[in-house]
């Protein structure tokens, strides 16, 4: 097999927070494929980077009292424990704010401009009147114009995958202030994706059988006329707005002061920038590397960013004169407990760093996710009970068990030296060797679940051989040393083959086994050979613990609830029992003007108010507010009165309503009476609703 040269990436995480389990799942999926390719002897450059630009980072940095650069650097500093902890073998980790990305993004733009695919248009852009700034796409929310989903971002819909302009949103609002944004004009730069050249290229590129069927079918929808929920019709591919206005943390557009590239233009360029950064460190020429006709380029992404990677990205590369991806591998989302969305507060969130800090073996998770992953973009489900059962049964009960049942006899009885398998043992080993091509093909096609099922079926056959021959009984029988050596040798040879087949998924365990068996680094080529008679192995040491249910309980334990706030009694008394809206509607509250006010002779508490309630006649109302107000303080003011309260005959006259005022239940502890007064503009007779 000739050596291939591969350039592999994962989607760039946005640099505004720590990795979540979705990131780790994608990195594990890509890492398994990369390790398989390396075990085939191929040259792989596997790179990642932080997506470091955009208004959300700029705003978050400002809130944190940092520059955007320092904010991103602090996030990047926390990546290593995750990547090392889960054995992710990136060759390089970079940032889209690096000089390589600035240079490459600007050059790609200039090449697209030279190709006649950049144009400017005056657009109406949302502006937050409360924050006094143009709103980034991710700070505008509303209803998707394509499928009608609510609370979607201003640049793309997470439900249907549509990409649109923020102004296309239905019922938009500012995510920063909640205000309804206003439109202001601004000149923007567009990539002419609707150009017939782009359409023809993308129709061919996306439908040539390379992409997953479900992905190709989804992308195909965007080339056809379609009716949107807002009543408009999309005729096909739309031009792509690639600019944003200052203030913005990003890469400046050449010869366009105050204009920056939209983050989704420079983010995928970050793949190339990270590769260039790696090659520069190796002293290799980036341009020569990319010009190699044998170079293969692959991207692993989630299904929520298909449009960017299968339309914009290949078109940008092709029409700027660069290599296009050989494939884009799309995966689904990770759910928990039969499709439930993960939630830390409900105790169903899987925090990858917490997993590591609890001392849980990262290769348990690598194995479990691999056993669920396939070549389609289906969601996969994490079930804690299934996780424990599968890891304990497959890895410990089947795979590790083979070595633990044989290695001790080899070391104690035969000084660690292997023998020669007999005919029945050779037949079993040939079955294992014969499975190698199929297992390799499944890894190549990213059908990890099928590959691991094949491996575990082989492990079952080996364990059946062990159970049939019972080395622990052979060890007790005089004259059976040769058979004992034969059986145990077959077990060790089989264990080595199974280790080769599992090594892309379990790299750390693979290294332990290589040390134990004294084999050197194992590759798939080694599946056709054997350790051989006379080979000396090391002393067996326990290779893997079982999953403990206590660890799982701790992993999914919800965070401690915030202490309950002290129960407050508003105004010094408990709230009244709930009423219905119909109950409230019976009370007719009206705005009243206090035309006159006077003290009541014989009372220290009451004031007599003459009120205009808009009826064309005055009302007489007594109110117990004399301790707080003098008559001259109230005359000419407006207040709120209960207008339909039945007249009440009092010692000093008839009261024809009730003026609303507030006070504390304990007037001695908190003295004060406060008559309600509407804001300016209210007039007598208006109803309070």
Curated annotation (Swiss-Prot):
GO terms for cellular component: cytosol. The keyword Aminoacyl-tRNA synthetase applies. Residues 583-689 form the tRNA-binding domain. ATP binds at residue 344. Pfam families: tRNA-synt_1g, tRNA_bind. Its cofactor is Zn(2+). This is Methionine--tRNA ligase. The gene is metG.
């Amino acid at each position: 097999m000739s050596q291939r040269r591969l350039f592999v990436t994962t989607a760039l995480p946005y640099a505004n927070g720590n990795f979540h389990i979705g990131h780790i799942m994608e990195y594990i999926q890509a890492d398994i494929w990369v390790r398989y390719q390396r075990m085939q002897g191929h040259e792989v450059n596997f790179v990642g980077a932080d997506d470091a630009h955009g208004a959300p980072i700029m705003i978050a940095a400002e809130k944190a009292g940092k520059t955007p650069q320092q904010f991103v650097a602090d996030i990047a500093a926390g990546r290593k424990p995750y990547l090392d902890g889960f054995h992710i073998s990136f060759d390089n980790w970079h940032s889209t704010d690096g000089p390589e990305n600035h240079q490459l993004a600007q050059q790609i733009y200039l090449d697209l401009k030279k190709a006649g695919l950049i144009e400017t248009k005056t657009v109406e852009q949302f502006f937050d009147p409360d924050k006094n700034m143009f709103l980034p796409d991710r700070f505008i929310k509303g209803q998707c114009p394509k499928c009608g989903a609510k609370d979607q971002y201003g640049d793309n819909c997470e439900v249907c995958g549509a990409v649109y302009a923020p102004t296309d949103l239905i019922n938009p609002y500012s995510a920063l202030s909640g205000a309804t944004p206003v439109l202001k004009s601004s000149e923007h730069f567009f990539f002419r994706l609707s150009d017939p050249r782009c359409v023809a290229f993308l129709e061919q590129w996306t439908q040539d059988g390379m992409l997953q069927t479900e992905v190709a079918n989804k992308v195909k929808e965007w080339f056809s006329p379609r009716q949107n929920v807002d009543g408009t019709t999309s005729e096909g591919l739309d031009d792509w707005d690639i600019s944003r206005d200052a203030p913005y943390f990003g890469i400046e557009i050449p010869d366009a002061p105050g204009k920056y590239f939209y983050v989704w233009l420079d983010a995928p360029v970050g793949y190339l920038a990270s590769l260039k950064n790696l090659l520069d460190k190796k002293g290799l020429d980036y341009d020569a590397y990319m010009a190699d006709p044998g170079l293969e380029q692959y991207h692993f992404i989630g299904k929520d960013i298909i449009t960017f990677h299968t339309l914009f990205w290949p078109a940008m590369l092709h029409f700027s004169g660069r290599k296009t991806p050989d494939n884009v591998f799309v995966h689904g989302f990770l759910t928990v407990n039969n499709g439930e969305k993960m939630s830390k507060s409900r105790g169903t969130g899987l925090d990858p760093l917490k997993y590591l800090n609890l001392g849980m073996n990262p290769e348990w998770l690598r194995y479990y996710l691999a056993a669920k992953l396939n070549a389609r973009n289906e969601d996969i489900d994490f079930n804690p009970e299934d996780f424990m059962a599968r890891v304990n049964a497959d890895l410990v009960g089947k795979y590790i068990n083979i070595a633990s049942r044989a290695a001790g006899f080899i070391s104690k009885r035969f000084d660690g030296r292997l023998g020669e398998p007999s005919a029945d043992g050779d037949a079993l080993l040939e079955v294992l060797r014969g499975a190698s091509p199929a297992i390799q093909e499944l890894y190549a096609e990213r059908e990890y679940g099928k590959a691991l099922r094949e491996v575990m079926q082989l492990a079952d056959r080996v364990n059946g051989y062990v159970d049939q021959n019972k080395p622990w009984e052979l060890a007790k029988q005089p004259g059976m040393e040769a058979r004992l050596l034969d059986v145990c040798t077959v077990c060790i040879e089989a264990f080595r083959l199974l280790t080769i087949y599992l090594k892309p998924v379990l790299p750390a365990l693979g290294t332990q086994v290589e040390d134990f068996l004294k084999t050197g680094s194992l590759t798939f080529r080694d599946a056709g050979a054997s350790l051989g008679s006379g080979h000396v192995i090391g002393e067996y040491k326990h290779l893997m613990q079982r999953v403990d249910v206590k660890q799982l309980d701790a992993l999914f334990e919800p965070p401690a609830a915030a202490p309950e706030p002290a129960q407050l009694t508003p105004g010094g008394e408990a709230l009244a029992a709930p009423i219905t809206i119909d109950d409230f509607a019976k009370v007719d509250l009206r705005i009243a003007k206090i035309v006159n006010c006077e003290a009541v002779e014989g009372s220290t508490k009451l004031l007599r108010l003459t009120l205009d309630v808009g009826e064309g006649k005055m009302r007489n109302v007594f109110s117990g507010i004399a301790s707080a107000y003098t008559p001259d303080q109230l005359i000419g003011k407006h207040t709120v009165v209960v207008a339909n309260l039945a007249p009440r005959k009092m010692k000093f006259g008839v009261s024809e309503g009730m003026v609303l005022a507030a006070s504390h239940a304990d007037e001695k502890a908190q003295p004060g009476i406060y008559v309600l007064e509407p804001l300016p503009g209210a007039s007598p007779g208006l109803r309070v609703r």
